[in-house]
Amino acid sequence: SVTDAPIRYVVSTHVHGDHIGGNEAIAKAGRTRAGGNVVGDIGAAATATAGIIAHENVLKRLSMDPPAGQKPVPFGDFPTETFFGDKREFLFNGEAVQIIHEPDAHTDGDSLVFFRRSDVVATGDLFTTVMYPFIDTANGGTMNGYIKALNAILDITVPNNVNEGGTMVVPGHGRLSDEQDVIEYRDMATIVRDRIREYVKRGMTLEQVKAKKPTLDFDPRYGSDTGFWTTSMFVETIYKEMVKENPPAPAKGNQRNRNQSKGSGA
């Protein structure tokens, strides 16, 4: 519900600028709460802004030198509190809140935020309704990890009795959703991944896989030929991951040459 009370915490679900770029401004509009024994100037400083919470990998990524041509992230957008491991849990306004780390998915620092009593999940970019999964390999993302994260969302969501509604799912981009929307997105991601994996096992090149159009039946809903994340980029990213997962067997001639070399050296 909406309240006039000051914001106490900002949760950064991952490292991307469109999700952390407002951290400093929002934090300055809020106040955190210090312990009862923190008084005077120290206490005032400790409560002057809202806390910014993120997984430790977000802080690690922000602390690295930015890519060429990009400005460093302002220090005020950095998390002030980080957590290690799988999750952080706390009570807030009488409600249990879980911040759950999903590794190696969209990035390596993604978190879900689950409000248990309200039955609301904020997913960050681990789920969207407007595009194919963005796998940021430069920041530790993988397709297999992304699908695992979608399954993790489904582990904590429930439908209502007509299979629509139930747990409210707040995506990183797009409309408010429910469990059924996540199921459809998870199924799409799994089908496309499995198609490309099978093509890789057959020894197809990237261009041959693209010619097969493994996303064709989903393109009207999620596809794009323009922008920072195109359908072609999505396919190529999965292809490269599947090649690492299923490396091509050495050519017979090369194997024979290696065996001969071993024999001559004996």
Each model region followed by its residue ranges:
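Sec/Tat-exported extracytoplasmic proteins
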Residues: 2-7, 24-30, 34, 56, ...
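Extracytoplasmic/secreted cell-surface and envelope-processing proteins
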Residues: 18-22, 61-64, 130-132, 178-180
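PEST-like low-complexity, intrinsically disordered acidic/proline/serine-rich tracts
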Residues: 34-47, 58-60, 99, 133, ...
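Accessory terminal helices/loops
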Residues: 32-35, 159-166, 175-266
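Metallo-beta-lactamase
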Residues: 42-191, ...
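Active-site metal-binding motif and surrounding structural segment of the metallo-beta-lactamase
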Residues: 1-42, 48-50
